[in-house]
């Protein structure tokens, strides 16, 4: 299936990308931008932003849509990683940072303690940087979620990924209701925290199902939703079922913001979980909450 013209991306600024890549290489850090073959890597790196991928690069799950390497071996966590992330945030002068992880089902708490350490390291190295964490489902372990909550990042993101009807095919080790419950638990325990979720389209869902997922998310007071076109990483991954038009992405945004009252819906063909995440600071400013 040929990509339509609206999925073309601008050539990246090689000089800026090279600078960021050298820094990440020097500090031995991974980014989801590279590991997941994100189409926005040029734009984000050129703008001096990155989403750090911790506890990787191998993932203990093998979701058929994802380009991150599968690795079910038992691996220790690198306890120097949080300090290196803090240093990178400081050297890159990031105003907003996103920290995400692979699934680490081999760890007792799914890696929640490592998230906490990374949040603390960023706070120490760059106190004014706002922190967003994109967390796995921790196999539904609420104690793990509570650890991350206690560290008080500004925003917690957990992606719902797709619609219930095709969940088992797209995310075989995930559970739709479990992800909803996780997001509900987060908001129920800290109503001042901003919550976020995202999904892909083009996997076999229909537009009505996308809107139903958005309604489910808004019912549990999720604040921000991201919606983007699924792009198959290769022949061993799930195929693309359809290309959603820019007009329909605009419709998702309009319905989400004007009718469902999300604070923000980021909905474009190239949107990914952390796309334009730096704009979150403006969202906080315009919609302040108590600390």
From Swiss-Prot:
Disulfide bonds: none annotated. InterPro entries: Aldolase_TIM, Elp3/MiaA/NifB-like_rSAM, Lipoyl_synth, rSAM. Transmembrane segments: none annotated. Its EC number is 2.8.1.8. Residues 45-263 form the Radical SAM core domain. One of its GO terms (cellular component) is plastid. Its main location: plastid. One of its GO terms (molecular function) is lipoate synthase activity. Coiled coil: none annotated. [4Fe-4S] cluster 1 binds at residues 33, 38, 44, 274. SUPFAM superfamilies: Radical SAM enzymes (SSF102114). Binds 2 [4Fe-4S] clusters per subunit. One cluster is coordinated with 3 cysteines and an exchangeable S-adenosyl-L-methionine. Keywords: 4Fe-4S, Iron, Iron-sulfur, Metal-binding, Organellar chromatophore, Plastid, S-adenosyl-L-methionine, Transferase. It catalyses: [[Fe-S] cluster scaffold protein carrying a second [4Fe-4S](2+) cluster] + N(6)-octanoyl-L-lysyl-[protein] + 2 oxidized [2Fe-2S]-[ferredoxin] + 2 S-adenosyl-L-methionine + 4 H(+) = [[Fe-S] cluster scaffold protein] + N(6)-[(R)-dihydrolipoyl]-L-lysyl-[protein] + 4 Fe(3+) + 2 hydrogen sulfide + 2 5'-deoxyadenosine + 2 L-methionine + 2 reduced [2Fe-2S]-[ferredoxin]. The keyword DNA repair does not apply. Pathway: Protein modification; protein lipoylation via endogenous pathway; protein N(6)-(lipoyl)lysine from octanoyl-[acyl-carrier-protein]: step 2/2. It is found in: Plastid, Organellar chromatophore. [4Fe-4S] cluster 2 binds at residues 59, 63, 66. Pfam families: Radical_SAM. PANTHER family: LIPOYL SYNTHASE, LIPOYL SYNTHASE, MITOCHONDRIAL. Belongs to the radical SAM superfamily. Lipoyl synthase family. This is Lipoyl synthase, organellar chromatophore. It comes from Paulinella chromatophora.
